Amino acid sequence: MLFRFFLSLFLCLRWTQPASNPYLSPPSLPPSLTAPRVQELLGAITDLGCPIDLDTMVDCRKCNIAATGGFIANHQGLKEGEYKPKVVVCEDNLLGSHYVAQTLAHELVHAYDQCRAKVNWRSCYHYACTEIRASTLSGECDFIEEFDRGNFGMRAQHQECVRRRAELSMMVNESCKDRAKEVIEKVFARCYQDTAPYDKIP
């Protein structure tokens, strides 16, 4: 437990240092930030014209819930149409830069969707769609990840993983959790096939 605490603290400190810190400046970027999926998503968000400031966008904190991260579409109460999301990384539930990168990729898919489509987070259908996309594109349902969870040998395993993890993500939304499975099934085919900003599932 003590090792886990110090490892989590170390990972988080690498995200909360000032911008002048070499960890946040090339060529010494933290491994989680240099992960290809994270880099591609950050670039895609920028290409859409949405500003990114990692010093304020990424918040590493102790979450005290069974989650690795979260996404806040507008954390400063800005006017409609303004883009100022917050990506939360839960320091108490991550054990290495691989998982930090995976969590960042998941939450950055939400940030991309917010920039591209102005997600209505009150709509269970919009919420389900972005969770399906995040689980599909972040790498959390890759074969090796499912193998480590003991889930393998099933047909369409990737799709089953995406359904399962999207439903888990929707459980934190009081307005949608009772309808999560139903809503996911209604939008699954369309949202699973929407792999933007990638040409296909990476």
Q: Model regions: which residues?
A:
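Active-site recognition of the HExxH zinc-binding catalytic motif
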Residues: Q102-Q114
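Glycine-rich short-loop/terminal segments
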Residues: M1, C12-T68, E82
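Residue-level detector of functional hotspots within protein domains
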Residues: P36, N93, N120
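Metalloprotease/metallohydrolase-associated module, dominated by Zn2+-dependent proteases
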Residues: E40-I52, K62-K86, H98, C115, ...
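Acidic, Ser/Pro-rich intrinsically disordered regulatory regions that embed short linear motifs
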Residues: K86-V89, L94-Y99, L104
